[in-house]
């Protein structure tokens, strides 16, 4: 599963990375394909408690289904941070894709691996897969 900031404009980068990984023949757990799960056009969730619950439960279901979480460190995200913590707590591998410097220790601490570009990511995934 690829996760990153959806609410703060990162959904296109998530989709792009899913495409790259599919082209490299990785099995993808794509949490964005289901209808209604791309909420990038929603600017205020304060009066949408039911939708919030639905989105969070959906995303956590996909965290559970995943073997590896690839986290895009392109911008801060409440949801991504929670997904990282939960993934770590249930024994999933977390890879942080950090193309730019990271000015906080939190995502580094909750990552098993840190890569700086997609080529490093692909090499690491191949190593983790055993190939």
Predicted regions span which residues?
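Conserved catalytic or regulatory cores that recognize and/or transform ribose-phosphate-containing ligands
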Residues: 1-131
